[in-house]
Regions:
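Sec-dependent signal peptide recognition
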Residues: 1-2
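N-terminal helix-cap/turn-to-beta initiation motif at the start of protein domains
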Residues: 23-43, 60
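C-terminal motif of bacterial Sec signal peptides marking the signal peptidase cleavage site
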Residues: 8-11
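Bacterial Sec signal peptide processing site at the extreme N-terminus
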Residues: 13-24
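Short, low-complexity, Pro/Ser/Thr/Gly-rich segments in the mature regions of secreted, periplasmic
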Residues: 140-149
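Contiguous, well-ordered beta-strand patches that form the walls/edges
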Residues: 49-53, 68-134, 140
Length: 149
């Protein structure tokens, strides 16, 4: 009876038992290395091929794990200023994760869980790395965003 009690006691721990230990370990390492660098406001802009339009993205990643993403299309005005002709704003929560791709390889992502009417939508954005100045992600058509000072 003592042996049964000891076995039950030892098998119950507060340590997580992930379904995929290697992905869990990679995710912990990813967060330790990059999480504190992620917080802040990031943006980039890109002229379209015809030069008459410009795509702009602004991503704000907050420490409470909320985000605001603004994707805009601008056109030049008569006075030389760019004017927004289309703007899409999304908000929700974000996290750094590691998932398995179709080839069973580990894939680091920035996961954006967007609040929408009637529910939420998850968006997996490939994550490469981040430093104090540049966030390298695959947020089409951008491959990097620069920190806003």
């Amino acid at each position: 009876m003592l042996l049964t009690a000891m076995t039950l006691f030892c098998s119950c721990s507060n340590e997580p038992h992930p379904a995929d230990p290697s992905a869990y370990k990679a995710q912990q390492e990813l967060r330790e290395k990059y999480l504190n660098l992620m917080y802040g406001e990031w943006q980039n802009e890109m002229p379209r091929e015809d030069g008459q339009l410009k795509s702009v993205v602004n991503l704000k990643l907050n420490e409470d794990r909320t985000f605001t993403l603004v994707e805009s299309t601008l056109t030049p005005g008569n006075n030389g200023e760019w004017t927004s002709i289309h703007e899409y704003t999304s908000e929700g929560t974000w996290s750094l994760r590691v998932v398995r791709d179709d080839n069973d390889e580990l894939r680091p992502i920035l996961y954006l869980k967007e609040r929408q009417e009637g529910g939420t939508v998850g968006r997996m954005v490939d994550f490469l790395n981040v430093d104090n100045d540049v966030l390298h992600i695959d947020l089409y058509p951008f491959s990097e965003l620069k920190r806003v000072e």
